[in-house]
Amino acid sequence: MQNINYSILINTCDKFDDCWDPFFKLWSLYWTDCSGRIYLNTEYKDYSYPELDITAVKGCDRHHIPKEKRATWSQCLKWALETMDTDIILYMQEDYFLKDTVKNEIIEEYISLMEKAKDIDCIQLTDQAVKAVSSTPYKHLYSVDMHHWSVISCQASLWKRTKLLELIRDYESAWNFEWWGSKRARILQHKYYVVDPNQVILDKFEIIPYIFTGVVGGKWYKPVVELFKKHNIEMDYTHRGFFERKPLSLKEKLYKKIVRLPIELRSSLDLMRLKVK
């Protein structure tokens, strides 16, 4: 397929730099025919990997943010998108470690479709992100259930860059973005699609086969160990430790609610403004 023009955003932050070499080693093995330009959304750090053309965004450095005053997740995402010059971007994160060959032809078919079809703002490429509700005229694409709480997701997805920028609010975390961004998307009447859940199934057939996800809550997800061992990737797992699911105490739940209150208020007011426009 010719003249496929898109960018790939690997969203990250500098404290996840231990993921970068493993990520791109697996990338170089499992996506050899990738034609998109790769952007690694670093804060201050530069980065390169042999035989891959990677642009380190260095958003905080470019915007002169002091290291003792961290930018928000959403600010960094916005700055990265603003550096790109393509209409369509593929969104991924630094701990989406590839485990098998990427179906590049399918991705390029969807990019070509998005360039032609004005009513496709996003295509979720996994069955793990949003709820599919009904088939569409587009081959192997379902419409996203816009009544479900999760309308947008930070899993692997193709986006119209301007539509993704419309959803971003500088003060939000990734979790805030998914929750409140889903509400904004409904008001803005964006058109979202997801791959056919009868065709794309985790661990059976995946367009971008990757671990969901390699780091959870800042700690390694245990399936990473086997994947890294298989590919001779050395890692000091003691630095992060391993994620273990534990129920939150009442005190922890209350603390999280209190911390979220200012963002909840700002995002609620923002929704009201969108509704009256």
Model-derived regions, located:
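Short, acidic, metal-binding catalytic loop of nucleotide-sugar glycosyltransferases
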Residues: 25-36
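Short aromatic/hydrophobic "clamp" motif used to bind/position activated sugar donors
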Residues: 89
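Active-site-proximal specificity loops/subdomain of glycosyltransferases
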Residues: 39-85
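Conserved donor-nucleotide/metal-binding helix-loop-beta segment in metal-dependent transferases, i.e.
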Residues: 101-131
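Membrane-proximal basic amphipathic "stem/tether" segments
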Residues: 2-4, 229-277
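Catalytic core and acceptor-binding pocket of nucleotide-sugar-dependent glycosyltransferases
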Residues: 151-219
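N-proximal low-complexity "stem/linker" segments adjacent to membrane-targeting elements
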Residues: 1-22
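The conserved acidic donor/metal-binding loop of glycosyltransferases
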Residues: 95-97
